[in-house]
Structure formats: structure tokens, C-alpha cells
Design a protein with these regions (language model features):
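A short, surface-exposed alpha-helical micro-motif characterized by mixed small hydrophobic
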Residues: 102-104
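Helical segment within the ABC ATPase nucleotide-binding domain
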Residues: 76-88
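Catalytic Walker B motif of ABC-type/P-loop ATPase nucleotide-binding domains
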Residues: 61-65
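Conserved ABC ATPase signature
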Residues: 36-40
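Conserved ABC ATPase "signature" region
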Residues: 3, 7, 12-32
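ABC ATPase "signature
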Residues: 120-121
Length: 151
């Protein structure tokens, strides 16, 4: 599968090998790459898809809910890989409902509700002194209420 993806993007053999080793090691998939994909758990399939996505160093990487199904280590590795890709002059566009991650990873954010664009701009401008979750709840007209449980 990974070779097929790299063939599509004409990734040279040497670069392909380096990328596979680096990414498979980072996502702890090295020992599993020769196994049938059908034997993978959901999280392993997600990691494989991410390795494929990063393996050709795209100028623009578009991901839909990339953190779903990942274990905590892979979660951290994905954030690092996204930052690394951006630091090399490329861009990552991803959707997520995990606003804490969006706030920490993104320098720009767009907030969409029911197909309507509520905000698009720098993360620091929308967040200010509040967290992105709080700002989002305010945009929704909802209030964050923390009620203590009886436990």
C-alpha cells in the first residue's frame, strides 16, 4: 500500500525508504507493515493512512478528523509531524472537533457551524485570553456550565 502511494507521487526509492523508516518508527508501525491491512485495528489503519499521507511530503495535506482512533503516543506524534511539515514551508488543513488540539497546533482557524463560516483568521486573534472551546461555545450561544456531581 505504502509503495503504491509513493509510486503515484513518484517518490524516489531512497527518499521513500527514509520516509517509511522514520514514519513507521514514529508511529510504532515498523513491525506491522508486512501484515495484512485487514488484520489491523482501527487505530493501526489510521496510522497507516497517516504514514501514507506524510510519505510524499505534500505541499498541502488535507486531513479529516485525523486524531480519531489514535492512541496517546500517536496523537502526540501526529501533532509533531503536522508542525514539522508546516515548518518546512508546507501547509496542513484539517478538520477537528478537538478544539484544544486546534488551539495548540494551528496558527489559523476557521469555525463553521451548519455550513456557515462564523470566523476565519489567526488563532491568537479569536482566542485572546480565552480558550478556543469557550469562544466556540459563545459563538454557538451556549454557555459553559460546570455543575458539581454528587459523587
Amino acid at each position: 500500500y505504502l509503495n503504491f502511494i509513493c509510486d503515484i507521487y513518484e517518490v524516489p526509492s531512497k527518499m521513500r525508504k527514509q520516509n517509511f523508516e522514520k514514519l513507521a518508527s514514529a508511529f510504532q508501525m515498523g513491525p506491522h507493515l508486512n501484515n495484512l491491512i485487514s488484520s489491523y485495528s482501527h487505530g493501526m489503519k489510521q496510522k497507516l493512512a497517516l504514514i501514507a499521507a506524510f510519505s510524499h511530503t505534500p505541499k498541502l495535506l488535507i486531513l479529516d478528523e485525523p486524531f480519531v482512533g489514535l492512541d496517546p503516543e500517536a496523537f502526540v506524534i501526529l501533532k509533531e509531524q503536522m508542525k514539522e511539515l508546516c515548518a518546512s514551508g508546507n501547509s496542513v488543513l484539517f478538520s477537528s472537533h478537538i478544539l484544544d488540539v486546534v488551539e495548540k497546533v494551528c496558527n489559523k482557524v476557521s469555525v463553521i457551524k451548519h455550513g456557515q463560516l462564523l470566523y476565519s483568521g489567526r488563532t491568537t486573534e479569536i482566542v485572546g485570553t480565552k480558550g478556543l472551546e469557550e469562544v466556540f461555545m459563545e459563538m454557538n450561544g451556549d454557555e459553559i456550565s460546570v455543575t458539581p456531581t454528587k459523587e
